[in-house]
């Protein structure tokens, strides 16, 4: 052990160079500790100074960064506001555009698509029901009806206002409404399509016209075309006539002077089947055959023909014709207006006017009913009643309208609107002014005529537009009117606005004393003939269909054309 300690002491007392080192004293050790402490203090001070400098530098840099940060935040805020405004504007535009599209779809697109889908379903049902497979056969009727809200215009409901009184306005002027026309026409020239007759029922409408292949003579061989359809709304939200089925009757049957009625899901057509011309017919005893045609929505048709002996006539007639204008349906009966010549004249005093007329008496008016051109026969209007029209063989009864209630018998029509029956007759005699009133079909038959001073029709020189004094004449033209007010004082019509010529067809809305609003179809030289006007409402808004026989000179043909207008009814506020 001692040997090892000697070795260790020898090791620590000898330098690496081989010299011997002496042990350090206590003072020397204290001096070294102070030196190291000084060094540490200086280092700490230096570090503190460096730390302060670094903090100052960092603070300075942080101040600049905060300012830059504030500017950056402000720029970001401005950019955000701009983006927000841009997005808001874009969203607003998109919302408005989509709202307009939605509104357009709701108002127009959806109804059109619904109508199209309805027609597609109807066609599909029709095709499936027309098939016969083994013993199965579909007999159901196609569900066809007017668009929602559409109904024949009923004056009692239409001619009223929530506040104030209704009136016809002259401002703005009426205009033609756009839409298609699907009236039956001709495939040849130099012929005529004549005598349009339109009946608008609660569910469907019926339209009939006569197609003469060559010329326009009444006795010329002709097709009779009967259409059934419904009233829809087009993309402009205006009403249209849309035919569903059409039937063309044999040209060899030669139907003439047809009147129609639409009721339920069927159309009925009453026609004359003359074998001679009109003058020859009036000169002989007995009437030409009548025929009642029935057409349903599946295109099935049935016809009932009646000879003179099969018609229950209240008086002997030499000639009898349906009145061209539409008839009406009541419980168990169809009622048509007719006219014709009595074999033996009735006694009594007819409607007359003597005031302001020279050398005129009641006898003048009575004799004016006997038309020399028609063999001197007394021409009267009649009610043709088809009883039990749903039976296998309906019965026809004819009742003469008393001459005391009427002017010269002529073409015309009946309208059942609400609880009233309105009658129009063509002003064929000396009385040139519009003839429209309310008919009481009870016994005895009576007519309450509404005097109209503003509306008339062209006629021959002796019985022109302005004639008011009684004399024998047969003239005028069929231009019926539709009552807008319950008393038939306010009407819609198409008049040939001329003195003696069948020219210048003009749509007119009028009261008893003034033409309020009118629209000329083209110009005063345009030739035309018969006109018929029928009106409807769509959720209270009134529209009229006007069918006018227009002379197509370039094709040498006469053909009906369809026009539509909106009724210019307004409400006058109470003062």
Curated annotation (Swiss-Prot):
GO terms, molecular function: exo-alpha-sialidase activity; host cell surface receptor binding
Record's keyword annotation contains Hydrolase: yes
Listed InterPro entries: Hemagglutn-neuramid, Hemagglutn/HN, Sialidase_sf
Subcellular location(s) of the protein: Virion membrane; Host cell membrane
One matching Pfam family: HN
Residue numbers spanned by region Disordered: 1-27
Carbohydrate attachment residues: 77, 499, 511
Catalytic activity: Hydrolysis of alpha-(2->3)-, alpha-(2->6)-, alpha-(2->8)- glycosidic linkages of terminal sialic acid residues in oligosaccharides, glycoproteins, glycolipids, colominic acid and synthetic substrates
Region ranges (Incorporation in virion): 10-14
Summary of subunit composition and partner proteins: Homotetramer; composed of disulfide-linked homodimers. Interacts with F protein trimer.
Domain notes: The C-terminus (head domain) is involved in binding the cellular receptor.
Protein name: Hemagglutinin-neuraminidase
Organism: Sendai virus (strain Z)
């Amino acid at each position: 052990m001692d040997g090892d300690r000697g070795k260790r002491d020898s090791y620590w007392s000898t330098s690496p160079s081989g010299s011997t080192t002496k042990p350090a004293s206590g003072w020397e050790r204290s001096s070294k500790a102070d030196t190291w402490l000084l060094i540490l203090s200086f280092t700490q001070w230096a570090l503190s100074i460096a730390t302060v400098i670094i903090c100052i530098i960092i603070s300075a840099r942080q101040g600049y960064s905060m300012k830059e940060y504030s500017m950056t935040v402000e720029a970001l805020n401005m950019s955000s506001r701009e983006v927000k405004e841009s997005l808001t504007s874009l969203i607003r535009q998109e919302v408005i555009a989509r709202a307009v599209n939605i509104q357009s779809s709701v108002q127009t697109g959806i109804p059109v698509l619904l109508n199209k889908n309805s027609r597609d379903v109807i066609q599909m049902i029709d095709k499936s029901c027309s098939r016969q497979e083994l013993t199965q056969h579909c007999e159901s009727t196609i569900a066809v009806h007017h668009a929602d809200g559409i109904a024949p215009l009923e004056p009692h409901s239409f001619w009223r206002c929530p506040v104030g009184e209704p009136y016809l306005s002259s401002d703005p002027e009426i205009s033609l409404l756009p839409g298609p026309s699907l009236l039956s026409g001709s495939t040849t020239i130099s012929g005529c399509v004549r005598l349009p007759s339109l009946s608008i029922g609660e569910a469907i409408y019926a339209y009939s016209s006569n197609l003469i292949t060559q010329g326009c003579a009444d006795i010329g061989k002709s097709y009779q075309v009967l259409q059934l359809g419904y009233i829809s709304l087009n993309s402009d939200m205006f009403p249209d006539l849309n035919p569903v089925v059409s039937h063309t009757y044999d040209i060899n049957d030669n139907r003439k002077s047809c009147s129609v009625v639409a009721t339920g899901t069927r159309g009925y057509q009453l026609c004359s089947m003359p074998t001679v011309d009109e003058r020859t017919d009036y000169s002989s005893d007995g009437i030409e055959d009548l025929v009642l045609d029935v057409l349903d929505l599946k295109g099935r048709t049935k016809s009932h023909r009646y000879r003179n002996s099969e018609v229950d006539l209240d008086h002997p007639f030499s000639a009898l014709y349906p009145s061209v204008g539409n008839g009406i349906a009541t419980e168990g009966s169809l009622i048509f207006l007719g006219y014709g010549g009595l074999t033996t004249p009735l006694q009594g005093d007819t409607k007359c006017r003597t005031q302001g007329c020279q050398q005129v008496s009641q006898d003048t008016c009575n004799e004016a009913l006997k038309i020399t051109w028609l063999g001197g026969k007394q021409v009267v209007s009649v009610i043709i009643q088809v009883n039990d029209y749903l039976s296998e063989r309906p019965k026809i009864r004819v009742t003469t309208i008393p001459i005391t209630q009427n002017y010269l018998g002529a073409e015309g029509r009946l309208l059942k609107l609400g609880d009233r029956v309105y009658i129009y007759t063509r002003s064929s005699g000396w009385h040139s002014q519009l003839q429209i009133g309310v008919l009481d079909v009870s016994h005895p038959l009576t007519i309450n005529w509404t005097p109209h001073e503003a509306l008339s029709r062209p006629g021959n020189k002796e019985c022109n537009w302005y004639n008011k004094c009684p004399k024998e004449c047969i003239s005028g033209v069929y231009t019926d009117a539709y009552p807008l007010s319950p008393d038939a004082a306010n009407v819609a019509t198409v008049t040939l606005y001329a003195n003696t010529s069948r020219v210048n067809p003009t749509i007119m809305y009028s009261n008893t004393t003034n033409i309020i609003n009118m629209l000329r179809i083209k110009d005063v030289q345009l030739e035309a003939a018969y006109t018929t006007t029928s009106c409807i409402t769509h959720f209270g808004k009134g529209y009229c269909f006007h069918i006018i026989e227009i002379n197509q000179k370039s094709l040498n043909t006469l053909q009906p054309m369809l026009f539509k207008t909106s009724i210019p009814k307004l409400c006058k506020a109470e003062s």
